[in-house]
A protein has these predicted regions:
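Structured, solvent-exposed acidic/aromatic patches
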Residues: 1-40, 102-103, 120-136, 149-161, ...
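An aromatic- and glycine-enriched ligand-binding surface/loop that stacks and positions planar moieties
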Residues: 1-95, 213-216
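Short, well-ordered loop/turn and helix-capping segments at boundaries between secondary-structure elements
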Residues: 27, 82-85, 149, 168-172, ...
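Flexible, polar/acidic helix-loop-strand segments at domain edges
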Residues: 66-136
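Bilobed periplasmic-binding protein-like "clamshell/Venus-flytrap" ligand-binding domains
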Residues: 188-204
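In a subset of proteins, long, contiguous C-terminal domains/tails are tracked
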Residues: 201, 206-226
Length: 226
């Protein structure tokens, strides 16, 4: 079954949870080549990492943030730090952490500092988090896409139910029907910052090139809105 809480998928103590089907198993505090170095490239400030040196300047694009429905705060806040978001499991000794930036920095892949329930396994360029290759939500959404097939709309059946189970965990309303556009959006939101969006886009382009070219040409490329 899907893991109960979406944000828990990206915490060290929840590595190898029942939803994790294939994952890269890094060595906590391991040597170069067997350690997860992404922490320094993802975290935007050292407050979130308990003073550990990090240097990311990556931000969520406007186009990505626009994929989230208004009520989809669970997945959004587990993936990006949006202004005013509170994380009780980061900076635990100080009562939690509230993001006060004016852009949306990366949260997924940033589990906090050494003392934030991470057993001390946080160093610069060294995180204990597994890297997902395949989790059950991917199987569910792939199944939904297969059930939609070449049809314009899917209005029922196990494929729609599979997609709605993913939405249930995010505590957002169920869909009564889905289209190809819904599949794209759901996958982008569910797997944002899990390094699979490019592969999805290439696959979809080979299937529906005209649709995807139009999709690419109408994406918002900026990081700010005037």
């Amino acid at each position: 079954a899907l893991y109960d809480r979406y944000e828990d998928l990206f915490k060290y103590k929840h590595n190898n949870n029942p939803e994790s089907l294939i994952a890269m198993q890094w060595v906590p505090l391991g040597d170069w080549g067997v350690c997860n170095t992404l922490l320094a490239d993802l975290a935007g400030n050292s407050t979130m990492t308990g003073g550990i040196n990090v240097w990311s300047s990556y931000q969520a694009s406007i186009d990505m943030l626009q994929q989230y429905e208004v009520g989809d705060t669970i997945r959004r806040n587990a993936t990006f730090c949006t202004p005013g978001t509170y994380y009780p499991y980061i900076c635990i000794a100080n009562g939690g952490y509230t993001y006060d930036g004016n852009t949306s920095s990366i949260k997924k892949g940033v589990p906090g500092g050494p003392d934030d329930d991470n057993d001390g396994y946080i160093q610069s360029m060294n995180s204990p988090l597994n890297t997902y290759i395949l989790r059950l939500a991917d199987v569910y959404l792939t199944y939904a896409e297969a059930c939609l097939g070449n049809n314009e709309e899917l209005t029922g059946g196990p494929g729609l139910e599979a997609l709605n189970l993913v939405r249930d965990r995010a505590c957002i309303p169920r869909k009564k029907s889905i289209t190809f556009e819904d599949i794209i959006r759901e996958r982008r939101v569910e797997f944002s910052m899990e390094y699979c969006n490019w592969y999805d886009m290439v696959s979809w382009y080979h299937w529906r090139p005209d649709y995807m070219l139009n999709y690419f040409q109408n994406q918002h490329r900026g990081y700010t809105v005037d």
